[in-house]
Amino acid sequence: FLGGLQDHVDGGFARYCVDENWSVPHFEKMLYDNAGLLSLAARTSVLAAEFARKSEGEIAQRAQNLAWLAQRSAQGIIDFLNEELLTASSAAPAFAASLDADSSRDGRQIEGAYYTFSREQIALVTDPLIQRLPKGLLRFAPVAEDPQNFCFSLLRVPETNEIGVLHELRDAMRTLRRSRIMPVRDEKVIAGWNGLAIEALSEAALLLDQPEALALAEKAATSVWTMQWDENAGRLARVSFANRAEHGNEGTLQDYAALALGFLALGQASGHKQWAERASRLLGRAADFVDPETGVPRDAVQADARIAAQRSNIAAVTVLDDALPASGALYAKALAMHALQSMAAGDYTEADAADLESARVLSAHALALASDAPTQVATALEVQCIVSSPVQYLALSQWDSAEAKRVRSVALSLGLNVRHDPSLPGAAQTVQIQPCREELCQMPVAGMDGLFSLFASGKGA
């Protein structure tokens, strides 16, 4: 959150850093990277803040700093998605795929030209603030492949009284950037990548109380559904470009699963049932991607003969996370989250139970690979936690009290669904929390302290 991977001026994150100090990035910004980091930052902000409440001294301060940094990074990603990746279409604005690393300077294409600053430009933005700029806070790291230019980041967490001048500096740097030629944007609207962003924005809207994030998620979701879903065929186009969907290029399993997850999260955040209904339709088609004989998910319903031959006629999707979550694991997660939402709503059916079992089977490889390659099975591990946890959702006696909102935020950060049940017994002044798994519920516990005690006992883990 401090280093050069993050764009501290306009928000958002680059793909990776090119130096051992994490001070200079490869400047390309991808939609899916920022979607994943938005979810991580929003959850980290909530959980770190709760940890700070329960801690003292230096540990509490470090947790509080992490919560602040994570919230700042999440807001930066929201701003980046809205200001730099949202397409200009008035009819169907959605998220473009990426921003290039290169842009023009003095007639030449240079990596990072839009983002970096020369010594003269650094002096231009810092000199008016020089008396108030704190020492040991700012870092201008030299860019090896672009001599005499520097990348801005932070060396430490700013003190409360330093934030104002830091914002002034950022505004000055932003104004300077606006005089430059922007990097080229890849205008393709990819269904699955937008689904990941919609899911992350919906989570952030709830966790950080960010209505603008929810509005942005709804805008993109409406556009992708309107533009890329073929109502007559019941098919999803993988890509649209300039308000035209390529309906001859059906989405992959990854597109169906990721967009379904986005719609499920959006329905939960907005309270609008249409999104869960649309997610169900996407999952209905996604089921056709599972080989009926082997039960193995495939990239496409009909295997490409050339690809199948290279794979010994097995057209399975990858089971390992890479730059993107594994398609099979995303599908398993979508099935599990759909089932959990049904549980919390009191509508759990045999079909939901079957979907939950399918999710368990599709993610079972994570248990064998976790010790050797945890990052490559992270999505599948998340699914295993969902399906095996003794607590899958919570019922709350209160909904809008300050403590109830805290419980809801912590629950969502941990992947738990929540429902309102005012009939729960207990003291009226304290929120009562009932942990449940499928259709079986435990005795309620009182307040946030009771919930943490439950988790500490292992009964909620």
Predicted region positions:
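Glycan-recognition and catalytic cores of secretory/periplasmic carbohydrate-active enzymes
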Residues: 1-461
